[in-house]
Amino acid sequence: MPDPIKFISIDPINGMTQKKPGIVCNLINGEWVTTDNIRKDIVDPMNGEHFLQIPDTTDHSNFINDINLQKSFGTHNPLYKPERYLMLGEVCAKAAALMAKPEVEHYFTKLIQRVMPKEYNQCRGEVIVTRIFLENFSGDGVRFLGRGFSNPGDHQ
């Protein structure tokens, strides 16, 4: 791909083949971890070959231990960490701006199309909708996550 973006780690057009598969990792205790136990039931929709190395994670104890080690009280509370919501809003805005670049939009469109055989414009529509969501959410959307909602129902 011309002018690759720094975060790109796989080429959905010329990569992700049986000879050069895409590799999926588990995130455990802040580290990306691979495993020898790989799923064999996910095949390339274009030719039926195995093109992804996806961990067949059946032992969840590492994830549970990782969660138990994390401090959770106040971490996501907007009353304790208002700067976190500002930062998350900035992340959404920057992601949306990046997705507006034609080469990034094309990359994600081809990436979706590679794992889900759809027409180019269908996959591009998914990228555009996600970008628009991030644009909208980057404003007050993140701040409103800490707000309570009460909606009247039709029950008695």
PLM-predicted stretches and their roles:
Residues 1-54, 90, 94, 128, ...:
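Terminal low-complexity tails and localization/encapsulation signals of metabolic enzymes
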Residues 49-154:
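Glycine-rich loop-to-alpha-helix module at the N-terminal edge of alpha/beta enzyme cores
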